Amino acid sequence: MTIMRKTHPLMKMVNHAFIDLPTPSNISGWWNFGSLLGVCLVIQIASGLFLAMHYTPDTLTAFSSVTHICRDVNYGWLIRYMHANGASLFFICLYLHXGRGIYYGSYSYMETWNIGIILLFLTMATAFMGYVLPWGQMSFWGATVITNLLSAIPYIGTDLVEWIWGGFSVDKATLNRFFAFHFILPFIIAAMAMVHLLFLHETGSNNPLGIPSDCDKIPFPPYYTTKDFLGVVLLLAFFFTLVLFFPDLLGDPDNYSPANPLNTPPHIKPEWYFLFAYAILRSIPNKLGGVIALVXSXLXLALIPHIQTAKQRSLMFRPISQLXFWLLVSDVLVLTWIGGQPVEPPFIIIGQIASIXYFTIILVLMPIAGIIENKMLKW
């Protein structure tokens, strides 16, 4: 008798994706982040669903409904902090996952990489709209500043901004539509993650050596299910330490004040995971130039497969490219720090230097390093 998981139409799909899946025998802990992102998405959708049951997307009651969740709903404070810190955890895993893709040359799988970039943009959009919903000071002013950037688009900019706002300023209509989009986007992310997996399983996983591993594959369970489970346990330990002991560590105190259109906070800034892009935006004095740089900061990832010059796929045995990669990581950390600082000397010039360095490393240094390494290996 044939096994049901190999014959049943639905089970067969799951079987090919998770059970009878040949996997390279040497993939390291850096390959855990895909499954960890799946766990983060489940946490976010589950906690978000319970929050949506008690939240009201109205300018008069949004802030007090969040307060009500924290004070009156059973374990509402826990659900709210899980959702808020779950977003931070999601982005930590997302950036590490993308960094691993750059380091080990996973961008060679073009379809998987491009879907991953779309997933990054969708997640950023979802997180931005979610940050607006509590209707605190930083929610309101963050929404005003970021949506206003679209007015830099020539000719249609102003009309586009008013169309998104649903009026002449960020108001009830804006909050309502942001709530609707924030609710639907995670399900689109889940669907896109399925497509991401579909393309990945067409080619099979990459490995740290960046070489074909068809001659040395092992089954996914029990080896990598155990490994993924360990990753999930460590992730949840870190997550609940954050949620239960330091719930406001990554938040902004200004968001505990209700939104007031008549009072601007001294320093408007987004959540920490957008600070690197925000620093790039601020470092260009021209509005349209800043918006272009902001979009290009994440779009540059899509260029990496097209501008890579090295004959070796992974950076494991390429010390010059490794140097450029870790310079890029350091640069992103500097940009994140600068994004949270006020716009005054010396932070302005540091931000401008770091922004130039960011694009130079990705577009110039990495390809040059690849060419030099090819020459050194006489390829």
From Swiss-Prot:
Record text on cofactor binding: Binds 2 heme b groups non-covalently.
Organism the protein comes from: Dipodomys ingens (Giant kangaroo rat)
Keyword Membrane recorded: yes
Protein name per UniProt: Cytochrome b
Superkingdom of source: Eukaryota
Record CDD domains: cytochrome_b_C, Cytochrome_b_N
Binding residues for heme b b566: H97, H196
Residues that bind heme b b562: H83, H182
GO aspect biological process, one term: mitochondrial electron transport, ubiquinol to cytochrome c
Membrane topology per record: Multi-pass membrane protein
Residues the entry annotates as binding a ubiquinone: H201
Subunit structure: The cytochrome bc1 complex contains 11 subunits: 3 respiratory subunits (MT-CYB, CYC1 and UQCRFS1), 2 core proteins (UQCRC1 and UQCRC2) and 6 low-molecular weight proteins (UQCRH/QCR6, UQCRB/QCR7, UQCRQ/QCR8, UQCR10/QCR9, UQCR11/QCR10 and a cleavage product of UQCRFS1). This cytochrome bc1 complex then forms a dimer.
Cellular compartments annotated: Mitochondrion inner membrane
TM helices/strands, residue ranges: 33-53, 77-98, 113-133, 178-198, 226-246, 288-308, 320-340, 347-367
Molecular function terms from GO: metal ion binding; ubiquinol-cytochrome-c reductase activity
Alphabetic keyword roster: Electron transport, Heme, Iron, Membrane, Metal-binding, Mitochondrion, Mitochondrion inner membrane, Respiratory chain, Transmembrane, Transmembrane helix, Transport, Ubiquinone
Family per record: Belongs to the cytochrome b family.
Record-level GO cellular component terms: mitochondrial inner membrane; respiratory chain complex III
